[in-house]
């Protein structure tokens, strides 16, 4: 009887020993594993949240959530126009300029009659079209750029339209050290300055000139001269030597990204060969490019205000085109 009881006690002690040795350690192991998994999952969720925030963050005006029933319920509409059209103040002026000292307040108030919130209209002037490469950043919910159109400036206007309506990513070019090549149809060189006279010499695989002598700039082919802005296209995948006056012009190596869908261009024309299909009065086209045939700038702004719905419907608010990392108009 004593032996049986002793055997029973020994068996119980053995079972407790096994439990302490194995099961309790396993319980702690399982518990520790669950805690580690919980911590890691929270860290993963946090890192994904940070990535999402980084993706949508940019410097500039951050729009509110777009209300589908009220397309003008946005943070800002920026309108860019030449500062040369702001004339001297006084009644009876016939030059067609904005001669009213309160023109900005007048225009903003008229936009409010079309449903735009108070304070959402921002008027900005520029000196020359090359400013859009060098210094102007367009970060409003909607951006409208007004450019005077003339036959003498048709090439530069076409190129600035290409620049404004798309996203570009650019790097500075050091012409004293490097030769450059364009790697695809979306790779262009953007030149801007007071006088961009640029010539190039294409090179073969042995660095000899193709139709030119690299050592003689007089043999280079002229691709731009007497211009403040140029988007230069050369043959892809061919290295080039480039000659220009770096004191009067700057050059950037640029890659075109996607369309800047929150931006529209309005060209002001007085040409008799005006293309009426581009007029907002006829609903325009879906290319985010319009023309207004007028000489008086108050008439131009009245037309833009009255047909702003047509213009804005061709755009998309808060487009992905506004990125950090240089995907802004200044460097883009």
UniProtKB/Swiss-Prot annotation:
Signal peptide span: 1-49
GO molecular function (one): metal ion binding
Keyword entries, A-Z: Calcium, Capsid protein, Disulfide bond, Glycoprotein, Host endoplasmic reticulum, Host-virus interaction, Metal-binding, Outer capsid protein, Signal, T=13 icosahedral capsid protein, Virion
Cellular component, GO, one term: viral outer capsid
Post-translational modification: N-glycosylated. Intramolecular disulfide bonds.
Record-linked InterPro entries: VP7, VP7_1, VP7_2
Domain of life: Viruses
Localization, UniProt: Virion; Host endoplasmic reticulum lumen
Glycan attachment sites: 67, 152, 225
Major subcellular location class: virion
Quaternary structure, from the entry: Homotrimer; disulfide-linked. 2 Ca(2+) ions bound at each subunit interface in the trimer hold the trimer together. Interacts with the intermediate capsid protein VP6. Interacts with the outer capsid protein VP5*.
Function in brief: Calcium-binding protein that interacts with rotavirus cell receptors once the initial attachment by VP4 has been achieved. Rotavirus attachment and entry into the host cell probably involves multiple sequential contacts between the outer capsid proteins VP4 and VP7, and the cell receptors. Following entry into the host cell, low intracellular or intravesicular Ca(2+) concentration probably causes the calcium-stabilized VP7 trimers to dissociate from the virion. This step is probably necessary for the membrane-disrupting entry step and the release of VP4, which is locked onto the virion by VP7.
Similarity section: Belongs to the rotavirus VP7 family.
The protein's name: Outer capsid glycoprotein VP7
Organism whose genome encodes this protein: Rotavirus C (isolate RVC/Human/Japan/88-220/1988)
């Amino acid at each position: 009887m004593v032996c049986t009881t002793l055997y029973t006690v020994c068996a119980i002690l053995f079972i407790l020993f096994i439990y302490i040795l194995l099961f309790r350690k396993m319980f702690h192991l399982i518990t520790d594993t669950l805690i580690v998994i919980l911590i890691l999952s929270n860290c993963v969720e946090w890192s994904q949240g940070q990535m999402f925030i980084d993706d949508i963050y940019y410097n500039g005006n951050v729009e509110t959530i777009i209300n589908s029933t009220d397309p003008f319920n946005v943070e800002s509409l920026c309108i860019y126009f030449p500062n040369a059209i702001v004339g001297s103040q006084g009644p009876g002026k016939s030059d067609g300029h904005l001669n009213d000292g309160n023109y900005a307040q007048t225009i903003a108030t008229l936009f409010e009659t079309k449903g735009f919130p108070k304070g959402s209209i921002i008027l900005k002037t520029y000196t020359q079209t090359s400013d859009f490469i060098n210094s102007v950043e367009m970060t409003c919910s909607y951006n409208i750029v007004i450019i005077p159109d003339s036959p003498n400036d048709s090439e530069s206007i076409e190129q600035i339209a290409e620049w404004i309506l798309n996203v570009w990513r650019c790097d500075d070019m050091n012409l004293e050290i490097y030769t450059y090549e364009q790697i695809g149809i979306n790779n262009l060189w953007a030149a801007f300055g007071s006088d961009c006279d640029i010539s190039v010499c294409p090179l073969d695989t042995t660095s000899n000139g193709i139709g030119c002598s690299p050592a003689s700039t007089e043999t280079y082919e002229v691709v731009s001269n007497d211009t403040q802005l140029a988007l230069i296209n050369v043959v892809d995948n061919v290295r080039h030597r480039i000659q220009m006056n770096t004191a009067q012009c700057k050059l950037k190596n640029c890659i075109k990204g996607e369309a800047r869908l929150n931006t529209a261009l309005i060209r002001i024309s007085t040409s008799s060969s005006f293309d009426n299909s581009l007029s907002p009065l006829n609903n325009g086209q879906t290319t985010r490019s319009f023309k207004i045939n007028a000489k008086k700038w108050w008439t131009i702004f009245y037309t833009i205000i009255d047909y702003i719905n047509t213009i804005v419907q061709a755009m998309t608010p808060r487009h992905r085109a506004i990125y950090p990392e240089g995907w802004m108009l200044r460097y883009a």
